[in-house]
Amino acid sequence: MRFNSSIIVRRLTKVTTSNSAHEAPQFLSCRLPGKAFISVRGPDAVKFLNGLITAKLAPEVVKKSLTTVNPDVREVERHPSISGFDLRRGNWGIYKEGTRARGPYISRFGTYSAFLNSKGKVLTDTVVYPAPLGLPDGAAAKYPEYLLQCDAIFVEPLEHLLQRHKLLQRVKIARRDDLSVWHVAIDMDAYPEWEQSFSWRSEFWKPMVSLHNQDDALRFARWFIAQFFAGAEGRLVGAYYDTRNVDPTKKSNIFYMVTTGDVDDIATLFSPQMVSSKTTAVSVPYTEVRRARLRRGVLEGVSELRSEAVLPLEVNFDLYEDAVSFDKGCYVGQELTARTHATGVLRKRCAPVIVSNSASLDTLATSSRLDLYTDYVIPAASTSPSPTNSPFASQNPRPRKKQPIGKLLCVDGTDGVALVKLIYIERSRSCGSIECYVTHPETGERVPIYIDLQNRPIHLPE
């Protein structure tokens, strides 16, 4: 199926009578602080990154078994819907498994992923952007090029990691200090022309995941720029469509947009061509963006994930689109990740939580991770058999120490994310709010925490 931009343009340019009862459409934006970029470019860029991150970037994988890759065994896999092309030539974009799209596709929009250590724990998360987004005429297109986004405090360790694994790979690795990344929310549904009928799932996501060759992927990226950021082709370097833990039936209106460093306000680049109504540009404080993300249960960056502390499946990478692959062969940290997935033995997951009296936690360092307790008793676990009497037992047995059910990982105001035992997550999903608490390490105050997955759900695959 070839991408036909005229079909979508006709759908996007429908005009109806303006309705003053609609709220004014808004373009919400925030420059994300503390982010840095590393460029990886060259004929081996895809193979190089595919062996280091959790996402699958190569449609062709030479495998001897699920855990080894042997270049002497030519068992080449390629999905029949993906057209044949040389991964080493041309700036063709990025391959996505399509774990939520019923099949793989080629795109020029980025992928969320992670670097793991040898024990399978997350070193850092990353967004991998094909760059530049729209490949302006005259742009270098001889080889694939990708931008890796990470926290600025981790860019040096990440660069060293890449250089250490480079060996004989034909890639160039360079830090990019001339870029900015923006959180953008495009409120298309509020335009009166659409009468609240716009759907990012139908109008953007479905066309994007139907593209199976590099030419259609490039046309789609150029169409996106022309429709939403007309005239800004040379200043938009990359884009990521953020669907992490959003309702899969509706999808998201959130993008990460990478621009050249001379862009002081991305709202000045926003120029929607499919509507005539005026758009209100709103600059959103970063704390609001972060709290909204925490309400979805999404951690981001080494300051929140804390390097080498959690497994990718514990922070829900398997629930995000194309963030982790279980059949692509070897990559650093793959063995434990694949085994955990295959055996189904995962005891904890991250979940959004509501913090009561959060002011008492404001003075704590962001690195503090407090044990999470609850007095709630799950009925099935409350009927354990009585221990057999022993003549050697103490007459005054010590009371059992209360065991935590998880850890509070991150808090901003009343919004937080906790790593919680799965049994409590399932209970909250079926029965509603579970009251928990943490104890302030300095004051001893008991701070209530609520797990309420009926109001702040973890969205499972469709």
UniProtKB/Swiss-Prot annotation:
Primary site of residence: mitochondrion
Coiled coil: none
Region (Disordered): 382-405
Signal sequence extent: none
Ranges of biased composition (kind: Low complexity): 382-394
Disulfide bonds: none
Lineage: superkingdom: Eukaryota
Keyword Methyltransferase attached: no
Localization in the cell: Mitochondrion matrix
GO CC entries: mitochondrial matrix
Gene Ontology terms describing biological process: iron-sulfur cluster assembly; protein maturation
Gene Ontology MF term list: transferase activity
Protein keywords: Mitochondrion, Transit peptide
Transit peptide stretch: 1-11
Family: Belongs to the GcvT family. CAF17/IBA57 subfamily.
Protein name: Iron-sulfur cluster assembly factor IBA57 homolog, mitochondrial
Phylogenetic lineage: Eukaryota, Fungi, Dikarya, Ascomycota, Saccharomycotina
